[in-house]
UniProtKB/Swiss-Prot annotation:
Chief subcellular location: cytoplasm
Keywords, ordered alphabetically: Amino-acid biosynthesis, Branched-chain amino acid biosynthesis, Cytoplasm, Leucine biosynthesis, Manganese, Metal-binding, Transferase
The EC number(s) this enzyme carries: 2.3.3.13
Cofactor(s) listed in the protein's UniProt record: Mn(2+)
GO annotation (BP), single: L-leucine biosynthetic process
Catalysis: reaction(s): 3-methyl-2-oxobutanoate + acetyl-CoA + H2O = (2S)-2-isopropylmalate + CoA + H(+)
Gene Ontology cellular component annotations, sorted alphabetically: cytoplasm
Residue ranges annotated for the Pyruvate carboxyltransferase domain, each copy included: 8-269
Descriptive protein name: 2-isopropylmalate synthase
Gene, per the UniProt record: leuA
Functional description taken from the UniProt entry: Catalyzes the condensation of the acetyl group of acetyl-CoA with 3-methyl-2-oxobutanoate (2-ketoisovalerate) to form 3-carboxy-3-hydroxy-4-methylpentanoate (2-isopropylmalate).
Organism per entry: Synechococcus sp. (strain CC9902)
Length: 540
């Protein structure tokens, strides 16, 4: 039987695999904010990035290792392909963390060996112990992944795993890279590893899975029943293609059905000991933070954290819930940190009160960013009678999102109506302080604003998504706007909020432009180096 840590470890890969969602690119300050909230959430491991991929990724992993990876905090992990250059960069990046981990991988399925790696099984069996041994010479905690394990020959998989453990791997990760397996198949794969790998008791079995068939969470729960003790997942289930296994769904499934899962961990059925170390009351807060910073809206019917997760429309259901919530609710909303919007602050609230509430919500701002956030708060308080936590989250997210900006919106003014053509006048300031103003017409006020901004910025792009939603109820509610721009096949998101949705649209468009420019500059300054014939964009 695999090494058993006594509970199920939660390995969060939001900052690595989750960030690979189209348009979800995060800057360093955003990654740090999410990592700090993940630490408050209580995850065991944070996979902070892929250090060899770029100077920006290296800096993000190193900064998180310095500021989040404390003695009692989460393990800080970096991803590395099975090459010495990747592994050395990863070791250097996680070095500041008291508890660091190198996560190295190579594909094991025949389709990957033939068409991607162009290597034989014999080649892989030689590479694995060499690279794992090298990683272990640099750090004590080494995780090894068999990419596309779900489509690998089990007998070959057993050989590779045995070799990796013998070389020093302390965690063995089994990825369902393309979300191909079914729960019974995936559970059987984990059971087979436990039965046929002689030294499996020296390592923890981990699983990583994508949601292409909507089975990722079900696969993971079946894996736990068969001996997996680490789950690699993301907040809101974000990730490549259809996403990854959802952290909040996994944690709450084991929380609500603890009596069912206890025996599979060798416990008595009625043991009250939690199956994970996650503080469930932080789940909603973490979900909202990730959604705000990535610009990826959580679907209303998303389990656990969706807007409708605890809503009841049917009269029969409403009647039952009013009499006893257990009639139609298996989770108390307070367990996941969800409470009714409350008036926590008002127009007379001071800077200290705003700062304290923002810290409770997971935002630790610099003095400069707090000053700007407080100014926006006071402006909003003059226009809006009730200020809620969602309002605060909306107005502060831009301070975290835009630490550096090529363009800054100075003002926007629009005129439109049933008998006039929509016209927008905008002023934009560049990084050198130069200010330019231009007017443009469009099919509507937002279209006119975007045309004017494009004229000023002169940055080629295609607008592929515009969405707006109300943060809270009421005619004076803040409107949140998300805009996605595409250039050269890459997506860049911008997110902003204001009581005037046209102003919010202008701010979101400028945010997206700034991300696009920064992304293009990173690509030109730090082109991907590829010392070995491996996939330059790992998905696991």
């Amino acid at each position: 039987m695999a090494k058993d840590p006594g509970r199920v470890l939660i390995f969060d890969t939001t900052l690595r695999d989750g960030e690979q969602s189209p348009g979800a690119s995060l800057n360093l300050e955003e990654k740090l904010a999410i990592a700090q909230q993940l630490a408050r959430l209580g995850v065991d491991v944070i996979e902070a990035g892929f250090p060899f991929a770029s100077a920006g990724d290296f800096a993000a992993v190193q900064r998180i290792a310095q500021q989040v990876g404390g003695d009692n905090g989460p393990i800080i992990c970096g991803l590395a392909r099975a090459s010495k250059a990747d592994i050395k960069a990863c070791a250097d990046a996680v070095a500041p963390a008291p508890r660091g981990r190198i996560h190295t991988f190579i594909a094991t399925s025949d389709i990957h060996l033939e068409h991607k790696l162009r290597k034989s099984r014999k080649d892989v069996l030689a590479i694995v112990p060499e690279m794992v041994s090298y990683a272990r010479s640099l750090i004590e905690d080494v995780e090894f992944s068999c990419e596309d394990a779900g489509r690998s020959d089990p007998e070959f998989l057993y050989e590779v795993i045995e070799a990796a453990i013998a070389a020093g791997a302390t965690t063995i990760n089994i990825p369902d890279t393309v979300g191909y397996t079914t729960p019974s198949e995936f559970g059987g794969l984990i059971a087979g590893i436990n039965q046929h790998v002689p030294n499996i008791d020296e390592a923890v079995i981990s699983v990583h899975g994508h949601n292409d068939l909507g089975l990722a969470v079900a696969n993971f729960l079946e894996a736990v029943k068969n001996g997996a003790r680490q789950l690699e997942c993301t907040i809101n289930g974000i990730g490549e293609r259809a996403g990854n296994a959802s952290l909040e769904e996994l944690v709450m499934a084991m929380h609500v059905r603890r009596r069912y899962f206890n025996p599979f961990l060798g416990r008595k059925e009625d043991s009250p000991t939690p199956l994970t170390a996650v503080r469930t009351e932080e789940l909603t807060k973490t979900s909202r933070l990730v959604s705000n910073l990535t610009g990826m809206v959580v679907q209303p019917n998303k389990a656990i954290v969706g807007a409708n997760a605890f809503a009841h429309e049917s009269g029969i259901h409403q009647d039952g819930v009013l009499k006893n919530r257990l009639t139609y609710e298996i989770i108390d909303a307070r367990t996941v940190g969800l409470s009714d919007n409350r008036i926590s602050l008002g127009k007379l609230s001071g800077r200290s009160a705003v700062r304290a509430r923002l810290e409770e919500l997971g935002y630790n701002l610099t003095r400069e960013d707090l000053d700007e956030a407080f100014a926006r708060f006071k402006d909003l308080a003059d226009r809006k009678r009730e200020i809620t936590d969602r309002d605060l989250e909306a107005i502060v997210s831009e301070q975290v999102q835009q630490p550096e900006a090529r363009f800054q919106l100075k003002f926007v003014q629009v005129s439109c109506g049933s008998t006039s053509r929509p016209t927008a006048t905008v002023a934009l300031m560049d990084e050198e302080g130069g200010e330019r103003t231009v007017s443009a017409v469009g099919t509507g006020p937002v279209d006119a604003v975007c045309r004017a901004l494009n004229c000023l910025a002169d940055v080629p792009n295609d607008l592929i998504e515009f969405s707006v939603k109300s943060v809270t109820e009421g005619i004076d509610a803040i409107g949140e706007v998300t805009i996605r721009l595409r250039r050269d096949g890459s997506l860049y998101s911008g997110h902003a909020a204001d009581t005037d949705v046209v102003v919010a649209a202008a701010m979101a468009f400028v945010n997206a432009l700034n991300r696009l420019v920064a992304g293009q500059e990173r690509q030109s300054l730090h082109p991907q180096k590829d010392p070995v014939v491996l996939d330059a964009r790992p998905t696991l």
